Amino acid sequence: LHQPYFCEENVWQLLRSPELPDPRAAVFVTNAARTVAMWGQRAAARDPIVWDYHVVLLLPRHGLIVDLDDRERPAWPVEAWLAHAFRRDVDEAFAPRFRVVDGPEFVATFSSDRSHMRDARGKLLQPLPPWPAPFDPARGMNLMRFVDLADPIAGVVVDAAGLVRIATE
């Protein structure tokens, strides 16, 4: 399943799949300013695109990142993906940080009512996925808590070297 512009839900759906090997994790790509420059994204007519956040799947034992929004291919060895998707010489304001959340924990805690995909008047910014929103009223809309790297909601926050360590341990 894949719906453009709903990367967090795409990863949430993948993490629920019994076919995926364990361990597995959700990786939020963002930074304090919410301005991450990424290359190779399908949503961009030309590179780079600047995302407020992006979410990919990590398969640590395999050292693989699954990015369903990548133009070239969906699965990459983590170091190759980092070299492909980011540039070392980019201004710090556009450099990525990563929140890595264990798959089962993300599936159990993530909740989105999709309100972030509506403008001030309530108009949809992008077409909705065909599946129901992964919203739990008891948790409320918590997507932006995962994006906020200072929020201790779940997982660990690391730089690129830390992501490589997690992916290859």
Language model features with spans:
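A structural boundary/capping signal
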Residues: 1-169
